[in-house]
A protein has these predicted regions:
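Bacterial N-terminal signal peptides that target proteins for export
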Residues: 1-12
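C-terminal motif of bacterial Sec signal peptides marking the signal peptidase cleavage site
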Residues: 18-21
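Bacterial signal peptide processing site
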Residues: 23-25
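Short functional micro-motifs and their immediate structural scaffolds
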Residues: 27, 51
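Short cysteine-rich clusters marking metal-coordination/redox-active sites
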Residues: 43
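Cys/His-coordinated zinc-binding microdomains
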Residues: 47
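Thiol/selenol-based redox catalytic cores and closely related redox-interacting motifs
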Residues: 91-139, 143-145, 155
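C-terminal partner/receptor-binding element of secreted or periplasmic proteins
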Residues: 137-169
């Protein structure tokens, strides 16, 4: 191998290494922590202020972005993960933990659970913040089952939420 060719390969390798080091895609990096809903947080699909709507909220962190994408309903969180035009490099997904809801049923906007670890009550009588039936997330399966006993519906995990449920009108 000539010196020129060796130098070119070394330079190329150094560039690739530098770019990959700066990409932020370190698989060992911990996911970002959930953020508090701020007064200026706006729902991704509805464009409305999150604090103006009752019910559980969601936030998704896309790799390479510091701020989360906000959602005013849990069905919207699922839609974002399913729609082909939305980003697929997701660093973290959080939903309000309704196990921490107040006695009036209002979501505690400081209580978050990893969406992939949550238990969801779907097809219940609960009307979410956008005026439609919504999936209700819980960190605790027992609390989810109790909610379903009272409000109807069934308990499923993140991967088991049917697409036709997410996109039903």
């Amino acid at each position: 191998m000539t010196l020129k060719r060796w130098a070119a390969r070394a330079a190329f390798s150094a560039i690739v290494l530098a770019v990959s080091a700066c990409s932020g895609d370190d698989p060992a990096a911990p996911p970002p922590a959930p953020q508090a809903v701020s007064a200026d947080a706006v729902g991704h699909y509805c464009g409305m202020m999150l604090l103006d709507h009752a019910g559980p909220k969601g936030q998704i962190f896309v790799k390479g972005r510091a701020a989360p994408v906000w959602f005013s309903s849990i069905k919207q969180v699922f839609a974002y993960t399913l729609l082909p035009e939305e980003p697929k490099g997701l660093a973290a997904i959080y939903v309000n933990d309704m196990a921490a809801a107040g006695p009036d049923g209002a979501a505690d906007l400081k209580a978050w659970v990893d969406a992939r670890q949550a238990f969801y009550v779907i097809n219940s009588s609960f009307i979410g913040g956008m005026g439609a039936e919504d999936a209700i997330p819980f960190s605790d399966q027992t609390r989810a089952l109790a909610f379903a006993q009272t409000h109807g519906g069934r308990v499923v995990r993140f991967a088991d939420v049917p697409e036709d449920y997410v996109f039903a009108q």
